[in-house]
Regions:
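Structural motif
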Residues: 1-4, 46-50, 89-101, 140-145, ...
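Asp-box/WD-like beta-propeller blade repeats and closely related beta-sheet repeat scaffolds
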Residues: 1-34
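Short loop/turn segments that connect beta-strands within beta-propeller blades
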Residues: 6-10, 52-58, 104-108, 145-150, ...
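A short beta-strand motif characteristic of beta-propeller blades
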Residues: 11-22, 58-64, 109-117, 150-159, ...
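Repeated scaffold domains used in trafficking and secretory/extracellular systems
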Residues: 23-32, 67-75, 119-129, 161-169, ...
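Loop-centered beta-sheet repeat module
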Residues: 34-85
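Conserved beta-strand positions in repeat-built beta-propeller and related beta-rich domains
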Residues: 39-45, 80-95, 127-129, 133-140, ...
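C-terminal hydrophobic structural anchor segments
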Residues: 150-181
Length: 215
């Protein structure tokens, strides 16, 4: 279930029950809002985007996508984007080629599905400040216009033999930040790139850097 919190008082004021989900068979991950509705991707052993009415705090609809949608963002055209990881070989929930989905927020329907190869592991879908360019990790770092008809052939940044583990874009200037877990044991590193892919800076942080948040 999803907890509702009063940010001024730091108090839990209620919760939203998610149908067909237990602690062992699902997780709610990221959220975006369109009008009075909040949308949330359900990841672990799930394949759904749920739609929540903020006036009633109830799940009112759901949309099936591929296995395990990992991210959720809303672009400048009011289109939601999610990417699935496809599960893993031997998973009791299934294993399939992952996909990137474009979903119309108004109709809550899938408009476009971009399929990856079986064994790919796309993640960390992000948008720039104008919300017209999409970024994600799939071994390399990829960038695509939100109106594109197909996934680009060449990556924004090529794989460099390390572990890209987190990704964000500065909403003010379009600079791309990449978290490198290196080997999951030593201090990780952050790389800062220009919107054109030029390395501007790099610095060490804590072990396994995996997420960013802009003030």
């Amino acid at each position: 279930r999803i907890f509702i919190i009063n940010p001024k008082k730091y108090e839990i004021t209620g919760y939203i029950q998610v149908p067909d989900m237990t602690m062992e068979s699902g997780s709610t991950e990221q959220m975006v809002q369109y009008g009075k509705y909040v949308y949330c991707n359900c990841w672990s052993y799930q394949n759904r985007i749920i739609k929540i009415d903020t006036e009633t705090d109830q799940v009112v609809d759901e949309l099936k996508v591929g296995i395990q949608p990992t991210s959720l963002v809303m672009d400048c055209n009011n289109k939601m984007w999610t990417v699935t990881d496809g599960g893993y070989e031997g998973s009791p929930y299934g294993y399939e080629a992952p996909s990137l989905y474009r979903i119309d927020a108004e109709t809550f329907t899938v408009e476009k599905q971009f399929k990856f190869k079986l064994g790919d592991w796309p993640s960390e879908v992000q948008l720039n400040g104008e919300r017209d360019k999409l970024y994600w990790i799939n071994k390399d770092i990829w960038c695509m216009d939100v109106n594109a008809a197909r996934v680009p052939v060449r990556p924004f940044l090529e794989y460099s033999g390390t572990i890209y583990y987190g990704l964000t874009v500065n909403p003010a200037n379009g600079e791309v930040y990449i978290a490198d877990a290196i080997d999951y044991q030593q201090q990780g590193k952050i790389y800062r790139y220009s919107p054109d892919g030029e390395l501007l800076d790099e610095f060490y942080v804590g072990i396994i850097p995996g997420a960013f948040c802009w003030k």
